[in-house]
Amino acid sequence: MDIIETIKEQIESNDILLYMKGSPNQPQCGFSARTVEALKACGERFAYVDILTNPEIRTNLPAYANWPTFPQLWVAGELVGGCDIITEIDERGELPVAVIQN
């Protein structure tokens, strides 16, 4: 299976998926930490992929997603966005709705 197929499978098999640097318990950058904090506040469970230990995903996902940065939040197979968008949605109090409705 090539890396794009792996990415597609990860996205399709997880309702809420976060591509991030590190893990939810040990984020390796401030953007990933802020995104994890917002997601945890929603109370929804989510899967994650550590792009630091998956260099092929780190290299290929930005082109596949047409989104250049990490973290990337995917909900129900759709890219929601990165840290800035997640933070903005969260500050409006709409993150739980965005996560559940997608």
Stretches found by the model and what they are:
Residues 38, 48, 60, 72, ...:
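Residue-level recognition of specific faces of alpha-helices
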Residues 44-58, 68:
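Thiol-based oxidoreductase modules, predominantly thioredoxin-like and allied folds used
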Residues 75-102:
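Non-catalytic, surface beta->alpha helical segment in thiol-disulfide oxidoreductase systems
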Residues 19, 72-76:
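Acidic beta-strand-to-loop metal/phosphate-binding motif
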Residues 1-9:
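Short N-terminal or domain-adjacent regulatory/targeting segments
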Residues 63-69:
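Thiol/disulfide oxidoreductase modules built on the thioredoxin-like
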Residues 8-45:
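Local sequence-structure signature of Cys/Sec-based thiol-disulfide redox active-site neighborhoods
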